[in-house]
């Protein structure tokens, strides 16, 4: 990638990529940090083109510098990046982010501004009696003191723009309440009403907020009734529910109640609490899914499930103890079976980091492939595949022919190969040399050419049938027929050898004696 997609030219980009993120660190700035900063600028109502010039970077620093001490990590990272860009535009050599921050504080006089924000211009610190200082210690927002009077400072368009974009993107999600708390810090009821009036859409949600405001205002009037009789001249009246809501009070009266009244009534903070209650009702309406319904899918990564779970916990209108109990009991209970087995093996009360580390990769395609490979390996090693459709009794585990142990075959046997006879099963000789099972002719089984007879070992076996009575031989029809054929054959041989003299059919020509005469 080149410098065409960044806020710097090629020479400035080379210098930018030599600056380290931390002192003595290995990581350095890259072009992806500039792209990330351009996307982050929209959240603060700033245009990304401001990063391309020195004046634009100074304007960004003026906006972000008041928020930097109490800002989030993303906001601090953006502020540090803009300070580095300002040094690059000013062609000042810096090695890391810390040096850039020190140079920016000096050139932009941020140290002097921080001191003047706490100390009045006269150089002498006044006492808090008489209402000369704001409750937060700063006199820049939402009002400034000029002489003995307080002057209202309206909200900046950037703040209103950030609020509108947050509502449009989140649609009254769980993030809206902390976003409103951050943007309305120290505001007067007039400023808060201005934040609500700039919302063109979501009028249904705003109507819910107005109903909550009316209920809280009525409750305030009941608990804080106005004093009977006329007020003394010059004394400020006590605020009512409509005064706190900003409908029957002016901006100057609101400032006097907050800063100069005796006793003081922070109408801005009270009205802010009412708005937060209404926004919490809107969040519950726009997020009807309860934390009890959040369950991990069979193929959902555990990290995504945790994000959805804590988002639902954030939207729940419950105390901290109840949310803690929900987290401890439901997070593991509603996980899928694969993650649940792993989480239960971690013991009692595992941390979220331990759970995320243990379930990393569970449910993904790689994890499924790994489990399938292990299952196939176990099936192959045990040889439990049923042939013939699974009919009959299951086969026993395989037995090794080499060592005689169960659980593996001969090709998987770890012991050295032994010479063993296939007939008798004894080691030391082959089947062709086996003398264990031979017949009475001296031949064993499977020796091909000679007739197969019963083994010699079975000739002397006792018969299982009882002996015939009187030691007589049992009748055998086959044996009887064989004897008849033998006798008949003997008679025919005798007749051919000695022909009868009185037989007229006998012809000597049929005999071989006629061929040789008396020589035979």
Curated annotation (Swiss-Prot):
Pfam families: Gag_p17 (PF00540), Gag_p24 (PF00607), Gag_p24_C (PF19317), zf-CCHC (PF00098). GO terms for molecular function: RNA binding; structural molecule activity; zinc ion binding. A motif (Nuclear localization signal) lies at residues 26-32. It comes from the Viruses. PANTHER family: ENDOGENOUS RETROVIRUS GROUP K MEMBER 24 GAG POLYPROTEIN-RELATED, IGE-BINDING PROTEIN. InterPro entries: Gag_p24_C, Lentvrl_matrix_N, Matrix_HIV/RSV_N, Primate_lentivir_Gag_pol-like, Retrov_capsid_C, Retrov_capsid_N, Retrovr_matrix, Znf_CCHC. This is Gag polyprotein. Late-budding domains (L domains) are short sequence motifs essential for viral particle budding. They recruit proteins of the host ESCRT machinery (Endosomal Sorting Complex Required for Transport) or ESCRT-associated proteins. p6-gag contains one L domain: a PTAP/PSAP motif, which interacts with the UEV domain of TSG101. Belongs to the primate lentivirus group gag polyprotein family. A motif (PTAP/PSAP motif) lies at residues 463-466. A lipid is attached at residue 2 (N-myristoyl glycine). Capsid protein p24 is phosphorylated. Specific enzymatic cleavages by the viral protease yield mature proteins. The polyprotein is cleaved during and after budding, this process is termed maturation. A zinc finger (CCHC-type) spans 398-415, 419-436. GO terms for cellular component: host cell cytoplasm; host cell nucleus; viral nucleocapsid. Matrix protein p17 targets Gag and Gag-Pol polyproteins to the plasma membrane via a multipartite membrane binding signal, that includes its myristoylated N-terminus. Also mediates nuclear localization of the preintegration complex. Implicated in the release from host cell mediated by Vpu. The record marks 439-440 as: Cleavage. Keywords: Capsid protein, Host cytoplasm, Host nucleus, Host-virus interaction, Lipoprotein, Metal-binding, Myristate, Phosphoprotein, Repeat, RNA-binding, Viral budding, Viral budding via the host ESCRT complexes, Viral nucleoprotein, Viral release from host cell, Virion, Zinc, Zinc-finger. Residues 493-504 have a biased composition (Low complexity). GO terms for biological process: viral budding via host ESCRT complex; viral translational frameshifting. A motif (Nuclear export signal) lies at residues 16-22. SMART domains: ZnF_C2HC (SM00343). Residues 117-144, 454-520 are annotated as: Disordered. Signal peptide: none annotated. Residues 122-144 have a biased composition (Polar residues).
């Amino acid at each position: 990638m080149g410098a065409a997609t960044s806020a710097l030219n090629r020479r400035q980009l080379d210098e930018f990529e030599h600056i380290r993120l931390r002192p003595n660190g290995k990581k350095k700035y890259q072009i992806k940090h500039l792209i990330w900063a351009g996307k982050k600028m929209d959240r603060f109502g700033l245009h990304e083109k401001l990063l391309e010039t020195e004046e634009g970077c100074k304007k960004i620093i003026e906006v972000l510098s008041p928020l930097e001490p109490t800002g989030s990590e993303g906001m601090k990272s953006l502020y540090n990046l803009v300070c580095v860009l300002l040094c690059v535009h000013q062609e000042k050599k810096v090695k890391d982010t810390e040096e850039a921050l020190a140079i920016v504080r000096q050139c932009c006089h941020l140290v002097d501004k921080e001191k003047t924000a706490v100390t009045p211009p006269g150089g002498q610190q006044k006492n808090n009696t008489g209402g000369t200082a704001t409750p937060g210690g700063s006199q820049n927002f939402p009002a400034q003191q000029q002489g003995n009077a307080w002057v209202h400072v309206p909200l900046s368009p950037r703040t209103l723009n950030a609020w509108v974009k947050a509502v449009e993107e989140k649609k009254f999600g769980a993030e809206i309440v902390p976003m409103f708390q951050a943007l309305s810090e120290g505001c007067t009821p007039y400023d808060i009403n201005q934040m609500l009036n700039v919302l063109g859409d979501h009028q249904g949600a705003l109507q819910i907020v107005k109903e909550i405001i009316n209920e809280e205002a009525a409750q305030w009037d009941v608990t804080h009734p106005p004093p009977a009789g006329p007020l003394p001249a010059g004394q400020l009246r006590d605020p009512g529910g409509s005064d706190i809501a900003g409908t029957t009070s002016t901006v100057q009266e609101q400032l006097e109640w907050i800063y100069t009244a005796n006793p003081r009534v922070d109408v801005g903070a009270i009205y802010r609490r009412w708005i937060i209650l209404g926004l919490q009702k809107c969040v519950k309406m726009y997020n009807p899914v309860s934390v009890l319904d959040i369950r991990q899918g069979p193929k959902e990564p555990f990290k995504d499930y945790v994000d959805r779970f804590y988002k639902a916990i954030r939207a729940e209108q419950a105390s901290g103890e109840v949310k803690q109990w929900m987290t401890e009991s439901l997070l593991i209970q509603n996980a899928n079976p694969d993650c649940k087995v792993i989480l239960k093996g971690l013991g009692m009360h595992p941390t979220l980091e331990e759970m995320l580390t243990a379930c990393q990769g569970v449910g993904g395609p790689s994890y499924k492939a790994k489990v399938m490979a292990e299952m196939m390996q176990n099936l192959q090693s045990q040889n439990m595949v049923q042939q013939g459709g699974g009919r009959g009794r299951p086969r026993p585990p395989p037995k090794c022919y080499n060592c005689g142990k169960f659980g593996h075959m001969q090709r998987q046997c770890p012991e050295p190969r032994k010479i063993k006879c296939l007939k008798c099963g004894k080691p030391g000789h082959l089947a062709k040399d086996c003398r264990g099972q031979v017949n009475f002719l001296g031949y064993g089984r499977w020796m091909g050419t000679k007739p197969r007879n019963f083994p010699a070992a079975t000739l002397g076996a006792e018969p299982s049938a009882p002996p015939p009575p009187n030691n007589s031989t049992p009748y055998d029809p086959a044996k009887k027929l064989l004897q008849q054929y033998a006798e008949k054959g003997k008679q025919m041989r005798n007749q051919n050898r000695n022909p009868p003299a009185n037989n007229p059919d006998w012809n000597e020509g049929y005999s071989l004696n006629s061929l040789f005469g008396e020589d035979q």
